[in-house]
Amino acid sequence: MLSRKATAILLVVHAAAMLASQTEGFVPIFTYGEVQRMQEKERYKGQKKSLSVQQRSEEVGPVDPAEPREEKQEVIKLTAPVEIGMRMNSRQLEKYQATLEGLLRKALPSSRNAQ
């Protein structure tokens, strides 16, 4: 027979496992401090990038503010088929079924018209 302490521990572990399987919550990968450090690095990169662009524009010459600026618009063309997937349990499927059906109705006719 198991002792009362072992039984209590197993019961707590089982309850925690059941709760974890039922939740749809967000599990943070990074700590709050790590996220702040990453944001600071991104800001620093952005400042560094804007300074280098500013220096290049000064080398070329002053830009007339009345002159319209042409911005490059890039279009990414896929050379291979792309497949996007997601996993859902039955409870999530019941919850989001109507939304998914609507998205599929919009996506499938548009892909048939394109072919």
From Swiss-Prot:
Region (Disordered): 43-73
First and last residue of the signal peptide: 1-25
GO molecular function: hormone activity; motilin receptor binding
Compartments (UniProt record): Secreted
InterPro entries reported in the protein's UniProt record: Motilin_assoc, Motilin_ghrelin, Promotilin
Top-level division of the source organism's lineage: Eukaryota
Gene Ontology cellular-component annotations: extracellular region
Keyword tags: Cleavage on pair of basic residues, Hormone, Secreted, Signal
Main location: secreted
Record's function text: Plays an important role in the regulation of interdigestive gastrointestinal motility and indirectly causes rhythmic contraction of duodenal and colonic smooth muscle.
Family statement: Belongs to the motilin family.
Protein name: Promotilin
Organism per entry: Ovis aries
Organism taxonomic ancestry: Eukaryota, Metazoa, Chordata, Craniata, Vertebrata
